[in-house]
Amino acid sequence: MGQVHLHNRSFNKATSAGFLIALGIVYGDIGTSPLYAMQAIVRGQGGLANLSESFILGAVSLVIWTLTLITTVKYVLIALKADNHHEGGIFSLFTLVRRMRKWLIVPAMIGGATLLADGALTPAVTVTSAIEGLRGVTHVYSNQTTVMVTTLIILAFLFLIQRFGASLVGRLFGPIMFIWFGFLGVSGLINSFLDLSILKAINPYYAIHLLFSPENKAGFFILGSIFLVTTGAEALYSDLGHVGRGNIYVSWPFVKICIILSYCGQGAWLLAHRGEHIEKLNPFFAVLPDNMVIYVVILSTLAAIIASQALISGSFTLVSEAIRLKLLPLFKIYYPGQTLGQLYIPAVNFALWVTTSFFVLYFKTSEHMEAAYSLAITITMLMTTTLLTYFLIQKGMPKIAIAFISIGLFCIEGSFFAASLVQFINGAYIVVLIALAIIFVMFIWNKSHKIVMKYIKSLNINEYKNQLNALRHDESYDLYQTNVVYLTSKMDHEWIDRSILYSILDKRPKRAECYWFVNVKVTDEPYTSEYKVDMMDTDFIVRVNLYLGFRMRQEVPRYLRTIVTDLMESGRLPRQHQHYSITPGRKVGDFRFVVVEEKLMNARQMPGFERFVLQTKAQIKRITASPIRWFGLQFSEVTVETVPLVLSDVRNLEIHERLEQVDETEAPATN
């Protein structure tokens, strides 16, 4: 209890080191939005020549109040309280509320898929926007091809170093982002003095007035560009477990002030230069003196790389959580760092690299990428709001307060979603298609698990204890292994999969000193590591339930070593003396793991939809990792056996013996 209380204190406590870590991990995406957000707003109005004072004030006001209502109110003040044992993100939120309604898995899948799709586009748009600052350096910039090649090289380097972990360069993230936000704040403050009337934008009147003003050429759809300023808000919630709530509470005011100052500085510059004709204007770089541009390009590129790294790492975490929640197939996961949160998934890394590079080559400029950027993340935010509503209900908040919060958020985010729909034909359809593909895989994987559970037959192990005891003493069979371990996906008290007992007794009688039946249960808590043992009133049958958090590695052999030691020390399991061993006094025998895989066979009587789901799953499994690596069995003795999933329509085919004499010449011989 004391350790839990101490952990709660550290989670809610803010430190100077935690402040820097938060800057480096949490705010990369939202912190780089000044690179391109104002550029998109100006372009939507038709360029600098078409800007009026009321438009500029209204646009900056929309930026300020979007950051306030969505990022500050929804995520910092409300969502950060919805932590699952100090972990945040849409899947952590889902595990908190999934018992309230079965259908809540739908917004969880949609939100997770769109967040992954957004994670592929963000590195492309942030790095490209930073490199495009070279347009102000004439002796460096030649054409857009230079920007594209430079961007592709940086992205290639970024994805190639993922296998080594981010801990080494990660130590620099915080200080670099502190410099970045300091630059945003100072430069924004200085440029605000170009026209101090920009401070009027704090008044929300200008934001509301712009939405209905005839001067606003984009009309309601300007919200599609405005939303770019808060696309990183979801990442803020997802990274809760990495930095703690206290550090976010302390660091967000600093970050928000710096970002708002940057937008105000850009707005003041626009006020001072409105009416001018400047091609391909990016206010972020336009406010800078010419001799500073190259240095700011370098700094902004570093900030963009850090933002991209945070999203890549976040994608790895998101996929690993989805796997443990049985929403995605198994992928090989490596842990290159020394901390629990550092992981690397080669398949996901390669997919992100290819997709991000495709976006750079397809869209070519940040201008075209921005058009496709915000739609997916608006969907994610709407799904998070749906889950958040049920969390507030679960916590017993007054219904009036819940209605006020939920309706308000749905109206605001729904407006951004509707405004972003126009971007569908401008390239957002690609991101939506990627999200739909991920949703399809999630649906197939989740549904197939439920179908398999329905068809797996169970037997009461108590009815077979005598046979197992007789087999272990039957010396007419060679000793298969001292310990035989079966991993089972379904184990309810004394009931286990029929296929397992068939494997032990029928397929090839497996004589062993001890039979282990292990079931891994993923808990709603992220870092649970517990087990429960039932010896079935014997000293040779061990039922083990492993309770592992959804962020824990499912490395069964390592946990079994601890369990065996505990059972022998408590006297529940006899010591297994080994006559031959390089380890003096070894008291534990050898182990063999048997993985029984159900294959779809004889499924003619299965409903067509279920057959389609299982056949699709089988095709997907061909390109995913095997259970052997997932459960950490690659260095153990393993046997993989295949059994048919459906046996209901297996019957003898009707055939009769021919009794009369047959002239064999009637049947022509076949060659």
Swiss-Prot record:
MF annotations from Gene Ontology: potassium ion transmembrane transporter activity; symporter activity
Which Gene Ontology cellular-component terms appear in the entry?
plasma membrane
The transmembrane segments are 18-38, 60-80, 103-123, 149-169, 173-193, 218-238, 252-272, 292-312, 343-363, 373-393, 402-422, 424-444
Q: Where in the cell is it found?
A: Cell membrane
Q: Which organism is it from?
A: Lactococcus lactis subsp. cremoris (strain SK11)
Q: Which PANTHER family match?
A: K+ POTASSIUM TRANSPORTER (PTHR30540:SF83), OSMOTIC STRESS POTASSIUM TRANSPORTER (PTHR30540)
Q: What does this protein do?
A: Transport of potassium into the cell. Likely operates as a K(+):H(+) symporter.
**What is stated as this protein's family in its record?**
Belongs to the HAK/KUP transporter (TC 2.A.72) family.
HAMAP family named in the record: Kup
Spell out the protein name for this chain: Probable potassium transport system protein Kup 2
